[in-house]
Amino acid sequence: MITFKTVKVCLLLIFVFVNIFYIAPCYSLVLREDLFKNALDLSSDGKFNLALQEWNRYLDAYPDDAAGLSNRGNVRLVIGDVEGSIDDQNKAISLNPSEIDPYINRGICEEALGLWSQAKKDYQFVISQDSKNFSALYNLANVEGSISQWEKARELFSKAALYNPGFAMARSSMALA
């Protein structure tokens, strides 16, 4: 005999299963996107200390998000935590080795520390994946100039300007090299 209590328990179980397998994942996805967007907006707005807090909060919940790690690494670089930035870029690369942005970001950190050969290696990797990546070409040109390889620097600045004609820094750097 089915009692009201049995029906109530069955409905409660159905509600719990629907919540666990349907509603909760949807809410989680929205929450994840909101956390990421908020941290990215704070970063873009130049509110770096707040952005770092938000990236930390995001990465506490989603520690295997390579894009989140790379973005937090960029914020860490801006606030002067170069080694922390390199750690984040290394983690991002280990999670998604085919994504090129963390290599560029790590190269910028290595330049800041005067680690020219490591920076050069990162930029060359990016160029091997995308020969028209003007950012990698420009940064590699900076490295070549830093080690007094002016002809190579000039050639790379020229390529960076060619692949992104609106990139005024590449043109002015080419003239100075």
How should these model regions be labeled?
Residues R32, A66-A67, I100-D101, F134-S135, ...:
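Helix-start (N-cap) detector for alpha-helical repeat units in TPR-like alpha-solenoids
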Residues S44-D45, V78, A112, S146-I147:
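Register position in tetratricopeptide repeats
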